């Protein structure tokens, strides 16, 4: 007498293994290309902030809500001129956090900022990503200009600035491990 449950289980196990192996192979070949495209987007945004040829740029991997941290030093020196943070915070979308690049000069002035990734609601949250939030000094968000009607997205962007503001003094004072 044949055990149909056992046969069905083995068939499902085999299908699962084949699918897992196929997914691993696809990921192996596509992961470098995906990273290359993501890096190209980030470096294009960095080029909007600074003339990259004028600086020695190093990268540090962040933890938690911080992604890559870009350290800009004047060519041939050890003096940090600016730090650009990749930082994330939860907006309206449950699936993806709002990700920003925030460029801060050594005097704590905000050079610029850009939302590089988001999946906020079209017509609402997604429309404010190019908004001027009136942040000129990273440790003073009193003038932060949120947008009415998109509170969660505005709060996510403010959280990104807050996270950078809490961290920047330590990083400029030697807290980064390059």
Regions found by a protein language model. Give the residues of each.
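Flexible, solvent-exposed loop/hinge segments and secondary-structure transition points
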Residues: 2-178
């Amino acid at each position: 007498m044949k055990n149909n449950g056992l046969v069905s289980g083995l068939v499902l196990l085999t299908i699962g293994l084949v699918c897992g192996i196929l997914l691993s192979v696809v990921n192996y070949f596509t992961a470098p290309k995906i990273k290359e495209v993501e890096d190209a987007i980030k470096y294009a945004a960095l080029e909007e902030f600074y003339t990259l040829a004028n600086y020695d740029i190093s990268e540090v991997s962040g933890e938690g809500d911080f992604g890559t941290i870009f350290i800009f030093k004047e060519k041939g020196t050890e003096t940090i001129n600016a730090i650009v943070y990749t930082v994330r915070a939860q907006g309206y979308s449950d699936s993806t956090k709002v990700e920003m690049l925030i460029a801060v000069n050594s005097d704590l002035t905000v050079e610029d900022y850009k939302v590089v990734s988001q999946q906020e609601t079209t017509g609402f949250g997604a429309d404010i990503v190019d908004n001027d939030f009136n942040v000129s000094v990273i440790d003073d968000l009193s003038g932060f200009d949120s947008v009415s009607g998109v509170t969660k997205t505005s709060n996510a962007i403010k959280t990104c600035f807050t996270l950078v503001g809490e961290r920047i003094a330590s990083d400029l004072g030697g807290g980064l491990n390059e």
